[in-house]
Amino acid sequence: MLTAAEVAELADVVREWIADDPDPVTAAELEALLDAQDWDELESRFTGLLQFGTAGLRGALAGGPARMNRAVVIRAAKGLVDFLREAVGTGRAPRLVIGFDARHNSEVFARDTAAVATAAGLETFLLPRPLPTPVLAFAVRHLEADGGVMVTASHNPPQDNGYKVYLDGGAQLIGPADREIEAAIAAAPGAAAIARTPVTPDARAVATRSAYLDRLTKRFAGTARGPLRIALTPMHGVGGEIVMDALVRAGFADVHVVDEQFAPDPDFPTVSSPNPEEPGATEALLKLAADVDADVAVALDPDADRCAI
C-alpha cells in the first residue's frame, strides 16, 4: 500500500511520462489509470525500466517505462544508435537494418527505430514488409551492416511485443554489448527530445527477401529425393509465404498448409499459445497431416526462427 506522499510522487512521474509520450493511445490509457486512481497498476508500470538483455526487450504492449510502447522503443533506438556510433568510430556512418513481424505495433516500432537512426546520421535499411527473423539476420550480413533490429516477440502471447538486437555478422546480441547498450538506453533523454527522420525502404532493402531465397536455393536446390508430402503451418506468423517459396525452389512441390493459420494474424485466434513446442498448438497441423497422409508435418513459430517437426 502506497502512502499519500508516494501516491503524489507517482502521479507526478506518470504525468511527466504522459507529456513526453509520442503515442496518444498509450497516453490516454495512462490518463485513464490516473483518473481511476489505479495506483497498483501504475506502480507496476513505473517501477524501473523494461529490462534490456541479450534477447533485447520483450514485454506487454502498454504505456509506461516498464512496458513495450513507442516511448520505450524510441529511447532504446537512441541507446543502440549511440552504442553503434561509439563502436564504429568516426571514419564512417554505421549501418543498421530494421525488420519487423506482423504483431501489433511491430511496423510502428520498426519505423520509429529507423527514424531515430536516420536522424542520427546512420545508413538505415528498413525492410519493406513483415518478414521472418532469419531474413533480418541474413540482411545484416548481406547489406554489410554493423547491427540489426528485429521487432518481434517470437512465440509470446499476442499482447506482447519485443525488440531483438543483432550485431555485425548477423549474430544475436551477447555480453558485454548488452550491458553497454542498456547503459546507453538509460542515459537517453525522453522520447520527445530524440530527433526522428522518417525513412522508406530503398531498393537494397526491398531486394533482401529475394536475395535470401536465392541463397537458400543455392544451398539446398536439388536436395529433394523423390516425392515428399509436407503439411505446414506458419502459426498465424510471417513464415508461410517465404517457406512455401523456399520449399518449391528446393523441389518440394507437394505441400499442404493449414489454411486458417496461414495468413499473418497478430491475435493468433486458433491457438491458445503460438509456440509450436506447447501441447495442443499443433492440433490443426497434425489433423491436416493425417487427412492428406503427409510424410512430415512442420510447424513454424510466428517469427519463423524455430520449428517443430
What are these regions (language model features)?
Residues F83, V116, A139, R219, ...:
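Rossmann-fold NAD(P)-dependent oxidoreductase module
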Residues L57-G59, G64, R103, L131-P132, ...:
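Short, glycine-/Ser/Thr-/acidic-enriched flexible segments
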Residues W17-D21, V25, E41-F46, L50, ...:
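Gly/Ser/Thr-enriched, mixed-charge loops and adjacent short helices
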Residues V97-D160, G251-I309:
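N-terminal small/polar loop signature for handling phosphorylated ligands or for N-terminal nucleophile
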